[in-house]
């Protein structure tokens, strides 16, 4: 209790400091949404404008990173904004974007709420509904607590926008992020559930981007908002299609003011995926079966659930995921499941291909290392035939590499893989 009271006092002091700085022309605080973020589904937001009536007017100086004077014209009323179109998504289902005159956009994230994105030099419209969080385009000093979203920033050449991360340097597999942390261009600010609030304020963070893990620590989200930091929750991991997960780069491109660049990147990746899919000729009977797993320190096997993006990529590459019979939906439940080795052996012994995940237990280079983890695996078909591969640890953090991952899986499945030229996998000899 004493610790909680101390933290509350500290936050209150920081709030007062922030407000004083704002009054003196320093950093402003964010426009905070009202009582709750409504649970919404993806789709058109054209009907939402009518909800703006009766809402209190918002002071534009209360948005971080904005100019207190805003644009030259008085801010428009939210309900008067005129819709001009919507983002034409291809695979993504968990977010939607509606465009409005004047460079405004309304972002809807499934189950996370709505966000009004305003141009850098524009004032905040009056009458913004309580359930809409105001974000300013092209934010600086981002606090990024959703590690899978970092690769979107990297691919867009926007890592300089990220000032703080909730992931330690040793847990990053992206070289550019490691370099940024080593140079001090990016700082570690504590675990997502216990960030350094003082540092977040001192670094003048304009937005916090969280994963859905933040729902396990709701008070952290509340405290960030209390301090004037708008919070956007990334739900890309809930996309049912791997290309939908990667399509979130278009949302980040919109946020960062480089939407055309993001769309061009995504279109190239989607074209690569289409090329792989068009090359598939296997029938259901001729598809090669794949086991994707790692052995835990406790001697069990950890496998992907059906519907998880890894198992989906295997299927999209032309393979058959060997554990498709397991219960659970990878898009909404835990992405993995731990089973005993006997159960794993029964399912995987006849798999044509084994792919060992190196993200937890480390990489393996020789079959002897795999057999040392469990002698039971020695007579598995893939081990006997020398068709065991290891997935690189960067597979999970390189969100924008989805199409390349599927292409490499397809090369492995069709026996065309050049082990020396693969980016995400290597052969276990």
Task: Indicate where each model-derived feature is located.
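A short, structured surface patch at a secondary-structure boundary
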Residues: 105-201, 207-214
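Structured C-terminal subdomain patch of bacterial secreted/periplasmic proteins
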Residues: 239-267, 277, 353-429
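C-terminal motif of bacterial Sec signal peptides marking the signal peptidase cleavage site
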Residues: 19-23
């Amino acid at each position: 209790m004493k610790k909680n009271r101390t933290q509350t006092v500290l936050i209150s002091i920081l709030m007062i400091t922030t407000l004083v700085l704002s009054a003196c022309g320093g950093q402003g605080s964010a426009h905070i949404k009202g009582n709750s973020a409504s649970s919404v589904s993806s789709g058109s937001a054209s009907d939402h404008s009518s909800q703006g009536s009766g809402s209190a007017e918002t002071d534009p100086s209360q948005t971080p990173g904005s100019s207190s004077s805003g644009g030259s014209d008085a801010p428009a009323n939210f309900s008067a904004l005129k819709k001009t179109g919507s983002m034409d998504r291809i695979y993504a289902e968990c977010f939607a974007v509606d465009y409005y005159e004047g460079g405004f956009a309304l972002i809807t994230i499934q189950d996370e709420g709505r966000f009004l994105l305003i141009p850098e030099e524009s004032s905040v419209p009056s009458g913004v509904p309580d359930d809409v969080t105001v974000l300013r385009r092209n934010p600086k000093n981002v606090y990024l607590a959703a590690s899978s979203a970092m690769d979107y920033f990297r691919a867009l050449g926007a890592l300089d926008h990220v000032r703080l991360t909730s992931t330690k340097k040793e847990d990053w597999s992206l070289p550019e992020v490691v370099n940024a942390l080593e140079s001090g261009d990016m700082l570690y600010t504590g675990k997502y559930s216990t960030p350094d609030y003082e540092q977040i304020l001192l670094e003048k963070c304009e937005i916090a981007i969280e994963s859905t893990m933040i729902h396990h620590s709701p008070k952290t989200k509340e405290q960030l908002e209390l301090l004037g930091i708008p919070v956007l929750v990334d739900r890309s991991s809930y996309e049912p299609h791997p290309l939908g997960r990667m399509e979130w780069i278009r949302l980040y491109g919109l946020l960062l003011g480089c939407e055309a660049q993001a769309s061009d990147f995504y279109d190239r990746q989607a074209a690569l995926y289409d090329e792989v899919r068009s090359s598939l000729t296997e029938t259901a009977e001729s598809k090669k079966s794949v086991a994707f797993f790692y052995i835990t320190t406790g001697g069990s096997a950890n496998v992907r659930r059906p519907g998880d993006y890894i198992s989906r990529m295997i299927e999209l590459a032309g393979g058959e995921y060997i554990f498709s019979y397991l219960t659970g939906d990878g898009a909404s439940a835990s992405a993995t499941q731990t089973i005993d080795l006997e159960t794993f052996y029964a399912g995987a012994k006849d798999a044509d291909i084994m792919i060992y995940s190196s993200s937890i237990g480390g990489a393996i280079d020789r079959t002897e290392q795999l057999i040392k983890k469990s002698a039971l695996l020695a007579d598995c078909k893939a081990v006997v035939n020398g068709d065991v591969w290891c997935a690189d640890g960067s597979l999970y953090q390189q969100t924008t590499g989805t199409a390349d991952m599927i292409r490499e899986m397809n090369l492995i499945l069709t026996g065309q893989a050049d082990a020396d030229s693969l980016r995400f996998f290597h052969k276990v000899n």
